[in-house]
Regions:
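Extracellular loop and loop/strand-boundary signature of outer-membrane beta-barrel proteins
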Residues: 25-26, 48-55, 97-104, 157-163, ...
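Residues that define the transmembrane beta-barrel architecture of outer-membrane proteins
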Residues: 34, 59-63, 107-111, 128, ...
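Gram-negative (and chloroplast) outer-membrane scaffold detector with strong preference
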Residues: 77, 82-149
Length: 275
């Protein structure tokens, strides 16, 4: 009896709130749950890690591209998922730690799931809507370095004598702004910082290894490149990176969104088009 009464009361509250929303937004109200939006973005990626030493003449910028979708959960919250591709790079030749002379370039995919929180409700139909985002994903790291005119993959060489995980978790957080330009189209800007659960995005983390344990002459040459700038070789145990700081990369993108909507909205549009 009590259980039935509780269900009845909760159902009544839900319909009351839903009815107030409909009255608030009048004929333009659409229940937000299930509204689907396709997203795309293009912009720049910026690297922050062991080979960055303040602002230098080598900014470490590269391109970034993303495609994904938003699935509306409530008036303010959406689940989001994306696949992204990015390139970042750095070269110590242009930094205060030029004596190490290490460099890298990586072109990586990443996949993530998260939550987006819009400042204005879905049914407010605001032309401009700021939002916040947070999520988690994975990235596949493919660091390379150029030597003798060739780009060599660094991870298989184990330049620090360590075999590291090339598919680490990535935690993301960011802000954005979306501006409606048509009934179903919007454009905007998004800034997203990506915290990698690894210090090997750039293949540099800890100390110089015992070079005799490395697998090849190529591995030894790419582990210690000081001689290329006329400096004496590094010694095992000397600092090569900063193991207490994990790597990050940041995206600044122009975004384009297309609202598909819910099944109910699609059905209503179909009825409007029919004579």
């Amino acid at each position: 009896m009590k259980r039935g009464l509780l269900i009845f009361l909760l159902s009544g509250i839900f319909h009351l709130v839903n009815g107030q929303n409909i009255e608030k937004y009048h004929s333009r109200y659409m229940h937000p749950f299930g509204a689907l939006t396709l997203t795309g973005g293009v912009g720049i990626a910026y690297y922050m890690g062991d080979l960055r030493d303040g602002v230098s003449s080598h900014p470490g910028l590269g391109p970034s591209v993303s495609v994904g979708a938003l699935y509306r959960l409530t008036e303010h919250f959406s689940a989001r998922g994306e696949i992204r591709f990015y390139q970042v790079a750095a070269d110590q030749k242009y930094s205060k730690k030029f004596n190490n002379n290490l460099s890298f370039r990586t072109r990586n995919p990443d996949l993530n799931l998260g939550i987006q929180a819009d400042v204005f409700a879905y049914n407010r139909h605001k032309k401009v809507n700021p939002y916040f985002l947070a999520g988690v994903g994975v990235t596949y790291m493919t660091p390379k370095a150029e030597i003798d005119g060739n780009w060599e993959s660094l991870a298989p060489l184990q330049t620090e004598g360590i075999k590291y995980n090339r598919l680490p978790l990535v935690f993301m957080a960011g802000i954005g702004l979306s501006s409606k330009i048509a009934e179903r189209w919007s454009i905007g800007m998004e800034l997203c910082n990506n915290f990698v659960n690894s210090d090997y995005l750039d293949d540099v983390s800890d100390v110089y290894p015992d070079f005799s344990t490395l697998s090849s002459d190529l591995a030894r040459r790419l582990s210690d490149r000081s001689s290329e700038v006329g400096l004496p070789p590094q010694q095992p145990g000397w600092h090569r990176g900063r193991p207490n700081r994990k790597d990050m990369y940041m995206f600044l993108q122009v975004r384009v969104n297309y609202l598909i909507g819910t099944r109910k909205e699609a059905h209503e549009r179909k009825n409007v088009r029919c004579p």
